[in-house]
Amino acid sequence: MAKSSYEKPDFWTQKAKKEGYPARSIYKLEEINEKFRLLKKNMHILDIGAAPGSWSLWVLRKFKSFHDQSMLVSVDLSDLTIPKDKPNFHFIQGDIFSDVVQKQLITYGPFDLILSDAAPATTGNSTVDTSRSEELVRCVLDLSAEHLKTGGALVCKFFIGGGQQELLSQAKSTFKTVRTYKPEACRTSSFETYLIAQQKL
């Protein structure tokens, strides 16, 4: 019998619940990190579109094994569902692209690694959704150029559409190495993938 297309998402959802994560998306980040070895000791990390908090919680759990000066700053319009009482964790509730939040980022940055699992509100119209996603990624790339350290890295979700090559070209103007990668934890039917940009120029 053929496997249901939702069998894999059910597996990841149950695994996330068992391990105490708010959402299954954590396994996308975990796989990306295993493949590209992005997380290292003594990093300042920015998590964009952090709610409900799975990626932030995963990073904080990694920090516990480092015993160093690592720091995480997470930003989202919505509140997080994870504990925020960590000395090396700062949550900013607001618009990442607003002047107010940008000034706060300058205080905490520059960053070694920027993570973005952010996505626009979807409409069900693939043309509209991919266009909105591409615009969001362009803004994240601009932000990365401003707030990433030289040599830093970016992980950013985007929806595959007609503007993919333009996004890659923009990334290549700022980073030495640019790839796309779709983790196993992504739904097979999903048109989301991740931009992996390393070694900021």
Positions of predicted regions on the chain:
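Conserved SAM-binding loop of SAM-dependent methyltransferases across substrates and taxa
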Residues: 52-66
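Mobile active-site "lid"/loop adjacent to the S-adenosyl-L-methionine
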Residues: 96, 108-151, 162-165
